[in-house]
A protein has these predicted regions:
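Hydrophobic beta-strand segments of well-ordered beta-sheets in folded domains
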Residues: 86-90, 573, 614
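A short small-residue
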Residues: 21-24, 273, 576-583, 614
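Conserved short alpha-helical segments that host acidic/polar catalytic motifs at enzyme active sites
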Residues: 1-547, 557, 565-566
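C-terminal accessory domains/tails appended to large, multi-domain proteins
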Residues: 553-556, 593
Length: 615
């Protein structure tokens, strides 16, 4: 289903940016109590300013994710449930009420086919009183809940995988059948469940009666209150999602989507996305795939998808650097700004992306560990607080309930790096272009070497250089030896309104959410950003047929081009992108251009499938 967002005139919803509120609270002894929900409500009530609200008082969205309460679900089902022996699915029902029964049948049959025996189906009770307001009540979607038993002997990761398969089967129908528009799984898990809606932060706990039920005892809760960013406010795009909640924007989202689609195509699979999917929802969908389809543990997946700025950080140990560099060969970075809360019932944690432009404050007592957007969201008695702090750029903190201990950035990275011999994996997967043998004995000659048939003035024209290019850009740079810096706006005409297309270089631009973020000075930019690029087939799941070549910049020197042509580490090929225009007949010329583009695309795809490498 189309996931494009609305654009009207000059308005583009994908460029909306605001700040959300996120956080988690967990009992360090793993004991389930209702007090966690009461304290969570206190935290949510403290940040109404971090959630958007319409003029009619309707919230952009708020929600919570909690571990499955034994006391509540034992009472509801009348069964002697044990941790890991049952699961819960919460679903928004279709917008068309006449399709509710069909949607319920789809969910129930899919669960049964997966061997997940349904114990109880019910509509989640809500407190739709006058405090919420009639328009806000109308904006909510009904949630139907399924409680199911796990097959005998199927537990832990095997059960998670079975449930995830059922979830994908439901999504494949729900997101592609127009009649079921609106059917959306908030969560389907044997570990956690999600409650959310078009609510304000202070409304979420009172609205869902289960969350106010004294029998609803949990050990972990994480929450989100939303300023609608790159989608219109809608209950399904409220957060948390299934494994995470996210404050910020993902400026790499388009690149991430293209990369994931290409990988899925190479595996003869397809990614089915909900309509109007936000960047945060896409991140959660990818995180679920890494954990439940590729077998990564949650912390490894989070670090691989949102790595620290390791390239210029000399404080990292060699094995941590090797691990992060190995991850970078196959995983596209999800760069924010982004503050991420992640949890699966056993692990609950928080992470900042490499830029660190969103706040995450930590507080710890003898009983609780909490990480939230702001300090003081929960009024812990001062004498009970053992330490306070913050998560720094590229940093993280998480609590492992299986081990009963916290991990912070350094310990977490060292523990992950010790799981594999990443130095050996890295050596087998990549080679730096600087380590390749030189293909030309004279580097100065190589830099000036040209194999085309154009004279120098014609090459200037081909590269769209004119008198202004030399007068205002290149001549000052040649004289000073420094990059030309100016503060004027970019006033060049777009290609459609210009006879001078501008060449490939004109398409290089940086997408950055500068509306809500402070400027980065050159020192911090060097710490947090890199131009490093890996060329060649990604080593996904160990199936790569060749080593990648790592280059320090996407702009290659002629000496680099000669090295790539001479090397035998990875296949390469060149493709003719010229076509013969049809003058005097616009339609025929259009058809010829489309045919030429399709032919080049098919050649490149054929090369990638047969050999893989650099095209």
């Amino acid at each position: 289903m189309d996931d494009a967002v609305c654009t009207v005139g000059l308005y583009d919803a994908s460029r909306e940016h605001s700040a959300c509120g996120v956080g988690f609270l967990t009992r360090k002894d793993s004991r389930q109590t209702h007090d966690v929900l009461l304290k969570g409500h206190e935290a949510l009530c403290a940040v109404p300013h971090r959630g958007g609200m319409s003029s009619e008082g309707i919230g952009d969205g708020a929600g919570v994710s909690v571990d499955l309460s034994l006391s509540l679900f034992r009472r509801l089902t009348g069964a002697a449930l044990e941790p890991g022996s049952f699961g819960v699915g919460n679903f928004f029902l279709p917008s068309d009420a006449s399709q509710h029964d069909r949607a319920s049948q789809l969910v129930a049959e899919t669960l049964e086919e997966a061997g997940l025996r349904v114990l109880l189906m019910r509509d989640l009770p809500v407190d739709a009183d006058d405090d919420l307001g009639p328009r806000a009540i109308k904006a909510q979607l009904p949630i139907r809940q399924w409680i199911f038993a796990a097959p005998e002997g199927l537990r832990d990761a095997a059960l998670d995988s079975r449930i995830h398969g059922a979830l994908l089967a439901i999504e494949a129908v729900a997101y592609t059948d127009a009649a079921l528009d609106g059917l959306y799984p908030l969560s389907l898990s044997a570990r956690m469940q999600v409650f959310k809606g078009r609510l304000n932060s202070w409304e979420i706990i009172p609205y869902f009666k289960d969350l106010s039920d004294p029998d609803h005892a949990v050990h972990t809760m994480y929450f989100h209150t939303r300023f609608s960013t790159n989608t219109d406010p809608h209950p399904s795009m409220a957060q948390p999602f299934r494994l995470m909640a996210h404050n910020g924007e993902l400026n790499t989202d388009k690149k991430n989507r293209l990369s994931e689609a290409a990988i899925a195509l190479a595996r003869n699979k397809a990614i089915v996305r909900p309509r109007g999917q936000s960047d945060s929802c896409r991140l959660d969908q990818t995180l679920n795939a890494r954990v439940f389809e590729e077998g990564l543990d949650l912390v490894t997946a989070v670090v691989a998808m949102m790595p620290p700025a390791w390239e210029n950080d000399t404080r990292l140990s060699p094995r941590v650097r090797a691990m992060l560099e190995y991850f970078s060969l196959s995983e596209e970075k999800n760069d924010g700004p982004a503050a991420l809360i992640f949890g699966d019932g056993t692990i609950i944690g928080a992470r900042l992306d490499r830029l660190g432009l969103r706040p995450l404050r930590t507080v710890e007592t003898a009983d609780y560990l909490a990480v939230m957007s702001e300090t003081g969201q929960i009024a812990f008695p001062p004498e009970s607080v053992t330490r306070r702090g913050r998560v720094e750029a590229g940093g993280m903190i998480y609590w492992n309930h299986a081990e009963g201990r916290a991990y912070e950035t350094e310990d977490a990275l060292e523990q992950l790096a010790a799981k594999e011999d990443y130095a050996a994996l890295l050596g087998a997967a990549q080679v730096n272009i600087d380590d390749l043998p030189s293909a030309d004995s004279d580097l100065k000659l190589a830099a000036a070497r040209y194999f085309g048939d154009l004279e120098r003035p014609a090459r200037y024209v081909a590269y769209t250089h004119n008198q202004e290019s030399f007068k205002f850009l290149m001549d000052p740079m040649l004289q000073s030896g420094a990059e030309k810096v100016s503060a004027m706006g970019y006033g060049n005409a777009i290609n459609a309104l210009s006879d001078n297309e501008g060449g490939v270089a004109k398409y290089f631009s940086q997408r950055f959410a500068q509306v809500t973020n402070p400027p980065l000075d050159s020192i911090r930019e060097a710490d947090g950003m890199t131009l490093r690029v890996a060329l060649g087939e990604k080593p996904h799941l160990g199936h790569s047929r060749s080593r990648q070549i790592v280059v320090n910049s996407p702009v290659l020197r002629m000496a680099d081009m000669l090295k790539i042509k001479a090397q035998t580490e990875t296949p390469w090929d060149r493709f003719d992108i010229l076509y013969e225009p049809v003058f005097g007949d616009a339609l025929a010329n259009e058809a010829a251009l489309i045919s030429a583009i399709d032919a080049v695309a098919n050649e490149v795809v054929g090369f990638a499938r047969e050999k893989g490498g650099i095209a």
